[in-house]
Structure formats: C-alpha cells, structure tokens
Amino acid sequence: IPGSLVGSEMCIRDSNKDKDGLSFDVVCPSMPGYGFSDKPSQKGYDSKKIAEINHELMTALGYKKYLVQGGDWGSTVSKWSAELFPNEVLGLHLNLVIAFPPEKDDPMEGVTDQEKVLLGRYAKYLELGSGYFEIQRTKPQTLGYSLNDSPVGLAGWIIEKFHSWTDDEKDKLIVSLEDVLSIVSLYWFSESITSSMRLYNENGREGFSKSKVEVPTGCALFKNEIMLPPKAWAEEIYN
C-alpha cells in the first residue's frame, strides 16, 4: 500500500517520451493478490515465492536474461530475484533500498553525520507512522472487511499514505488526483485490498534476505524517502 500497477504505467508513460533510439521490453507483473491477479488460495506466497513465480513467467515469455526493478514489497521481490537467479538477472534497480545494521562490533562504523540524521527521521516514522504496517501484518483479514466494504474508507486508507510518504507541497498531492483515484479504483473494483495486505503477514517483519547479492545494483534515492539506509549498510547487502 499504496502501490499498484498504475504507478508502473506512470513510469512507462514517462520513459517513452525520449528513448534516444533505445528499444527494450517492459514486463510489469502484478503480484499475486494484487489488482486483477489471482489471489493465493494457500499460505506461503511471500516475496521469495513471488520472485520464483516472476522468474517462471520471464522464462515462459522467452527471456533468458533480464533486469529487475522494484520498490516497496517489489524491492524485496527484486532482491530475491537477484539472489536466486544471478545467472539470468543482469542487474538490480531499486527505488526503495532496504538495509539493516550489519552484525559487527560497531554497526555505525562508516555512517556519516548526514546519514545519522536520516536514521533519526526513519526512527520518527517507526514511532508515528508505521502503525498501518503492524495492523496489516497481524490482522489483514480483519482490516480487510472494513476497507473492502467502504470506498471512502479504502480511499482514506490509501490516500493518507500519499500525503505522508510523498513530497507533497503545502498539503497538495504531488501525484495527480486522477492517478491516485485510479490506484484506489484498482483495489476497489478488483476487491484485492485484503489479499494484498496478506503479503505483510506472509513476509513477517521483514520478508527480506540479508545475504549479499553479486548482481550489479543501482538505486534511485529521493530526498524525502522514508528509509534511506547508510551507504555502508547497503554495501553489506548489494553490489
């Protein structure tokens, strides 16, 4: 939440403006339980499982080599793709970089003063803004009954995240209202808000492998990002 394929479509829309003669295919799989993708009928569909499904899809489509890109839970799925299929994944690109303190005597070694400020901002988010995560992780079905029964409730639950997590200016959404409503509508008409939240439960607190990937990695970093881990931490996990 609040991501969806609508965001991917927005990126594709912009990338087509000036390709400088480049030709490439873009495959945007909708994760199980999101949008109009089938809802899992059994447990076990965590980020690792989704990465395996995505690889099966790319193989079936005839791609022997490919790049992966992800943000939010897609970041963990993409990380798993690079870890599980290093011979097929040529590169990993993330717009949410997840990294945690390394397990060594001084985990703050190499962390700059500016990065410490960013860690403080993340700590504030954990204190004041992460309640949604715990609810969706522990009680996705209970919350889903309410959100799936009220379009206003669903819109409020999703749009609040856009206000809190984006670079909005003077309480004005930086994302167009039309695009935001498209995202809300996708969840509403597909009745997928409940099944999408189950991924939080499947992944537990992290849904993330801390093993280092050797696949070349690039990151998009934005000044108001919630999680901006120190470079020294990221280098312990990414190449």
PLM regions and their residue ranges:
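Single conserved hydrophobic/aromatic residue that forms the stacking wall/gate
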Residues: 1-12
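Conserved hydrolase catalytic core segment
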Residues: 15-23, 63-112
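Glycine-rich "HGGG/HGxG" loop immediately N-terminal to the catalytic nucleophile
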Residues: 22, 31-45, 79
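Structural beta-sheet core signal
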Residues: 28, 68, 219-221
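Conserved acidic catalytic loop of the alpha/beta-hydrolase fold
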Residues: 48-66
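The feature captures the conserved acid-bearing segment of alpha/beta-hydrolase catalytic domains
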Residues: 107-140, 209-212
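C-terminal subdomain of alpha/beta-hydrolase-fold enzymes, centered on the catalytic histidine
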Residues: 136-239
